[in-house]
């Protein structure tokens, strides 16, 4: 298995075709994954994440922490955990200032984070449980808040439940998330010690 820096074209295609979110995150970089037959399998992506203050709890600045934001793969890879392991080694080489990687398993999608456990990440708890995440249930389907914002903005309307119900679906509701399981992967000795102090048992994860 070989990983190479991914082009934007590869990133866009993989995110739209291979990942359940069907969206392309901004400010990302990553690696294209090729199997032993030299077939392209998709991408592993990292970025600054949606929260620019995500390093604050760990006293890290931007550039010292990144988020694993997508593993958009088509299934042709021999091992997903191997692809991630190689990507983590490349991050350490390509971003020498980076000390910590954070990622989340989406409970709403039934994800527990098995891939993180297989590659020795530290489980540190669940965030955003029973919280509104800005998305809505419209006509029986979950729609991301940004998508609705773009739609309503065309008509000069604000993104709120009242407008969504008035113009899109009278029975629309705000979506309440089941939460995201948070994992940390340290790249330095100091961060490893910190992660060990925060770490919780995988057996404690309930979805």
Model-derived features with residue positions:
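Short amphipathic alpha-helix that is part of the acyltransferase structural core
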Residues: 1-26, 39
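Short, cationic low-complexity segments
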Residues: 196-207
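An active-site-proximal beta-strand-loop segment
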Residues: 20-28, 34, 53-54
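Short, P/G- and charge-enriched loop/turn segments at secondary-structure junctions
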Residues: 18-21, 167-173
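Conserved beta-hairpin
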Residues: 15, 28-45
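Short hydrophobic/aromatic beta-strand or adjacent loop that forms the aromatic wall/cage
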Residues: 28, 178-183
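Acyl-donor binding region in acyl/amide transferases
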Residues: 5, 47-170
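Short, charged low-complexity linker/loop segments at the C-terminal edge of domains
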Residues: 188-198
């Amino acid at each position: 298995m070989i990983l190479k820096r991914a082009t934007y074209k590869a990133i866009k295609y993989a995110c739209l075709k291979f990942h359940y979110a069907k969206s392309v995150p901004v400010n990302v970089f990553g690696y294209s994954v090729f199997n032993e037959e030299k077939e392209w399998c998709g991408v592993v992506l990292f970025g600054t994440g949606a929260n620019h203050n995500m390093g604050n709890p760990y006293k890290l600045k931007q550039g010292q922490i990144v988020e694993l934001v997508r593993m958009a793969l088509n299934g042709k890879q021999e091992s997903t955990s191997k692809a991630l392991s190689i990507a983590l080694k490349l991050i350490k080489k390509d971003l020498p200032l980076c000390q910590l990687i954070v990622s989340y398993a989406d409970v709403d999608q039934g994800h527990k984070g098995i891939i993180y456990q297989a590659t020795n990440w530290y489980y540190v708890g669940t965030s955003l449980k029973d919280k509104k995440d800005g998305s809505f249930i419209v006509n029986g389907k979950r729609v991301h808040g940004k998508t609705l914002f773009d739609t309503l903005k065309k008509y000069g309307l604000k993104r709120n439940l009242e407008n969504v119900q008035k113009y899109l679906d009278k029975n629309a509701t705000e979506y309440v998330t089941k939460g995201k399981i948070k994992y940390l992967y340290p790249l330095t000795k100091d961060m490893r010690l910190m992660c060990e102090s925060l770490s919780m048992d995988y057996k404690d994860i309930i979805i």
